[in-house]
Amino acid sequence: MNLQVNHISTYSLIIEPNTKIYIDKVKNIDEDLDYEMYKLINKKLKKEKLIHYELSNYSKKGYESKHNLNYWNNNEYYGFGLGASGFVDKERYENTRNLNKYTNGIYIKEKYLVSDKEMLENEFILGLRKIKGINKKNFQKKYGDINNIKILKELINKKKLIENKNYIYINPKYLYIQNSILINFIDS
């Protein structure tokens, strides 16, 4: 913390099959230890006046990653260059990773139109990564009344989500196991 940084991203290392680190027999750490490290990181960064603004991100006031917040707000973005991805006019695309194709003007590897259902799922899955959660007025403008979503009401009643005047967000005690909440919004 002697570096006086303005922004820190933290992630648990997950060892994936068929990677060099997996092949070298490195094992994932115990979940309890991972959780203890998560709590320690939160405590230390809070002490350093870094704001926990997204599941894996902390910053000093005014130094939040605008680039990443654009993703978490489910907004459009362009991707330029090999392997880049973008999201424009409800269409997701991925550029080719092949340099020869790219230099010959064949930029897009694949693209698909995002359905209304998937847009709504993404709004919850991405928006609830933010500690502030989903802005209810912004949601209303995009999709209509947020109060009509059954799974949302169920999660609020179970105290996994919290609703205030302006936002719906994950109860802080469930942030570490956030994925177990977010999965409820897929195919709901």
List where the protein language model places each region.
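Short, amphipathic alpha-helical interaction segments positioned at domain boundaries
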Residues: K173-S188
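A short, conserved structural fragment
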Residues: I156-N166
